[in-house]
Amino acid sequence: MDESRPIFIQIAEQVENDIIEGALPEGSQIPSTNEFAAFLRVNPATALKGVNRLVDDGIVEKRRGIGMFVTAGARERLIERRRAEFATLYLRPLIVEAEKLGIDIDELAGLLRAERIQS
């Protein structure tokens, strides 16, 4: 866990990552808050706060007496949201810096391709 960020956010993000990567497909049950709490050694209320964040975002749904399940369309919604965040956090600053340095879009694309090959 990352000490600099709230644990409940990290729990929600891990479930989101598992959904995006296909480890938790739509309709599948996610671990219970008690399972999260035991595995991560955190207070069950902290785990519940992370899961409730996913419920509030419509990513998982509660099924009374059964558990929490990934909703239909959750993966697509998460990818759409992450793409928008990616553009805001990374692409816009990258483009601004490239313009300052006189790097045009074609050169920038070439730099990105070269970097991708190296990684």
Show the residue positions of the predicted features:
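A surface-exposed regulatory interaction patch that couples sensing to output
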Residues: 71-88, 92
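Extreme N-terminal segment that seeds HTH/winged-HTH DNA-binding domains in transcriptional regulators
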Residues: 1-29, 35, 85-119
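Short secondary-structure transition/capping segments
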Residues: 40, 74-75, 118-119
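N-terminal helix-turn-helix
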Residues: 29-62
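Short glycine-rich loop/turn motifs that provide flexible caps or phosphate-binding loops at active sites
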Residues: 21, 26, 49, 64-66
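Short, Lys/Arg-rich nucleic-acid/phosphate-binding segment
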Residues: 29-30, 62-75
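Short, mixed-charge, low-aromatic patches
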Residues: 4-10, 46-54, 66-71
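Generic hydrophobic secondary-structure packing signal
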Residues: 43-46, 83, 94
